[in-house]
């Protein structure tokens, strides 16, 4: 089973909406579970997160944090989820995770990705390989990746 944590309030910025759509479209590939009939469950806040951890999480579940940061680099719903992970230190034991962080400006995305990675790790979640992908407002940090893959910066991130 794949859980996608996408904490956001209010209107969804277009690029973030595209990010979530891309994650959901590829949910079966990410989860690797061909028998899984439900491709993904969306977790929007700490209540959804705790409910999933307590009732729906199975050994080997995958969890993807797809996070949008505003200009200030703050996402209050995300902080509430991180707080719950700190209180329930084994809530993600046996899970595998990935992190995608999208931001409105050039700051905060890498710092937030590291905070999420730390909390996931403390909660027992395994983060293999390249743990996170982050996109700054201009997508300048995707230039090298795009050049290597012969894509636009936007295509490289998605």
Locate predicted features.
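FMN-binding flavodoxin-like domain, especially the glycine-rich phosphate-binding loop
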Residues: 1-158
């Amino acid at each position: 089973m794949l859980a996608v944590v996408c904490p956001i309030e209010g209107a969804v910025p277009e690029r973030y909406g595209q990010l979530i759509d891309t994650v959901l479209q590829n949910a079966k590939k990410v989860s690797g579970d061909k028998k899984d009939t439900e491709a993904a469950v969306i977790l929007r806040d700490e209540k959804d997160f705790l409910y999933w951890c307590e009732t729906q999480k199975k050994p080997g579940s995958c969890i993807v944090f797809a996070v949008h940061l505003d200009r200030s680099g703050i996402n209050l719903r995300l902080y509430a989820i991180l707080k719950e992970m700190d209180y329930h230190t084994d809530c993600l034991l046996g899970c595998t995770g990935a992190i995608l962080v999208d931001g409105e400006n050039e700051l905060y995305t890498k710092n937030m990705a590291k905070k999420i990675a730390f909390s996931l790790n403390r909660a027992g979640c395994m983060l293999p390989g390249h743990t996170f992908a982050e996109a700054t407002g201009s997508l300048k940090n995707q230039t090298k990746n795009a050049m290597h893959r012969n894509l636009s910066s936007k295509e490289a991130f998605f």
